[in-house]
Amino acid sequence: MAREQDFAPGVGDIEIYANTDRQGIWLAWQDNVPLGCIAAVNYNPSYAFIGLFVVKPKHRGQGIGRRLWQHALKNLSSVECIGLEAAVQMVGFYEKAGFQKYCVTTRRQMLCRSDQSQHPNTTLLQRSDITVVPLREISLEAIQRYDERHEISPRPHFLELWLRHRAGDVFVARDSQGACHGYVRIRPCLLPIGEGWRVGPWLAEDPVMG
């Protein structure tokens, strides 16, 4: 469903969400046919994130999306802070539910020719004493410490599953002491037609590092 609606889900994303929160994925079914879905994933007791909220076009306007939404919020009722990314046409809906705009997310896309490499460029760059290395050359704990300083809330369980998933690659800006100064994950994604790549999370201390 998400692929059909141009969400471009990453390969393995649902698996990671489900393993982060066993009660975090909800679907609406009728006669063994999925009509809609929503992800409402607890990262920890104080923070959760909602995404993959979609209902098939021919089933919209029947209250399915609202029931999925209410079910997700009920499941997250004890969480202190809930985040989400809103499609432009859904901003009003979320504001009525009590959500406030925090920042604007810009989606950027690059189309590749069919004769180009099917795998992203993994050339490692160097700057000063900092080297860009693959995940295996730095400790997971170093990345988690960096992530905690730059994200709204700690998410060690989710982050471990996210970084170690077999789909895609992770690259880290590491200094000579083994500390993390930024990281990025690139993974294959499912486009409405064919496949592509998604980049994220992408955290860095400055534009040059990024």
Spans of model-derived segments:
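N-terminal non-globular leader segments, chiefly Sec-dependent signal peptides
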Residues: 1, 7, 31, 43, ...
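Active-site rim helix/loop that mediates acceptor-substrate recognition in acyltransferases
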Residues: 1-39, 149-171
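Core nucleotidyl-transferase/polymerase catalytic module
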Residues: 26, 88-89
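Conserved beta-strand in the GNAT
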Residues: 27, 32-41, 48-54, 172, ...
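Short alpha-helical
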Residues: 45, 89-92, 138, 154
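Conserved GNAT acetyl-CoA-binding A-motif
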Residues: 50, 69, 75-87
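Conserved acetyl-CoA-binding loop-helix of GNAT-fold acetyltransferases
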Residues: 52-55, 61-74, 92-96, 206-210
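Amide-forming acyltransferase catalytic core, primarily the GNAT-like/NAT-type
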Residues: 99-201
